[in-house]
C-alpha cells in the first residue's frame, strides 16, 4: 500500500494543460530517440495528446476521468469505466516524482475492490515495453491478445458463491 495518500476528483477544463504535460512526460523517453528538434517533438506530442483525448471522450463517454491529487497537488490521471460486463482501466499516469511509491498499486487495489464488488473482470491495454506491464502481471492480469502495438490484458473476477452455484 502507498505511504502517499491521494485523492481523486473529476477532470475539469482547467486540468487540460496539466494532463497534456503529463502525456508528454510519459512519452519523453520514447521521443528522446526520435532525433527530432524540440519544437517538432512538442508539436507532435500535442497532436497525439489531442487525438488521444478526443478518442477517449468519444469512445468512453460514460467513463470516470479523474485527476489524482496529493495534498492538493495534481500528480496524475486515472481513467476508468465500470460497464455491465467488464471494468476498464483506460489510462493511469503519474508524474515521475510520484512513480514507484505504491500509488499505482493502491489505485489498482481500489479498482479491483470495486470491480470485485460488482463481480466484474477488469481489462486494460498496455504497450509491451511499458514498466507497468510487470505491475499488472503482479495483480493477476493475463495477456488475452495483442492488437497493434498493445497487449490486451484481463483479470478475471474472483469466483463468488452465487456464480459457483449456477
Language model features: what each stretch is:
Residues 56, 136, 141:
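Conserved active-site tyrosine of GNAT-family acetyltransferases
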Residues 13-14, 21-90, 95-96, 108-110, ...:
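Acetyl-CoA-dependent GNAT
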Residues 100-113, 134-138:
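Conserved acetyl-CoA-binding loop-helix of GNAT-fold acetyltransferases
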Residues 5-7:
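Extreme N-terminal starter segment of soluble prokaryotic enzymes
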Residues 95-101, 128:
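Active-site acidic-Proline motif in GNAT/NAT acetyltransferases
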Residues 115-127:
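Conserved GNAT acetyl-CoA-binding A-motif
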Residues 9-11, 125:
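Surface-exposed loop and edge beta-strand positions of immunoglobulin-like domains
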Amino acid at each position: 500500500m502507498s505511504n502517499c495518500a491521494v485523492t481523486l476528483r473529476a477532470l475539469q477544463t482547467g486540468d487540460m494543460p496539466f494532463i497534456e504535460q503529463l502525456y508528454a512526460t510519459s512519452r519523453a523517453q520514447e521521443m528522446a530517440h526520435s532525433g527530432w528538434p524540440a519544437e517538432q517533438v512538442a508539436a507532435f506530442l500535442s497532436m497525439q495528446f489531442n487525438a488521444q483525448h478526443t478518442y477517449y471522450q468519444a469512445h468512453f463517454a460514460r467513463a470516470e476521468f479523474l485527476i489524482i491529487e496529493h495534498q492538493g497537488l495534481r500528480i496524475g490521471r486515472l481513467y476508468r469505466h465500470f460497464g455491465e460486463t467488464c471494468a476498464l482501466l483506460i489510462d493511469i499516469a503519474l508524474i515521475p516524482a510520484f512513480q514507484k511509491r505504491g500509488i499505482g498499486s493502491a489505485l489498482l487495489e481500489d479498482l479491483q475492490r470495486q470491480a470485485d464488488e460488482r463481480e466484474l473482470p477488469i481489462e486494460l491495454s498496455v504497450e509491451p515495453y511499458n514498466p507497468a506491464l510487470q505491475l499488472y502481471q503482479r495483480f493477476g492480469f493475463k495477456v488475452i491478445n495483442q492488437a497493434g502495438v498493445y497487449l490486451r490484458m484481463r483479470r478475471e473476477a474472483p469466483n463468488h458463491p452465487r456464480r459457483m452455484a449456477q
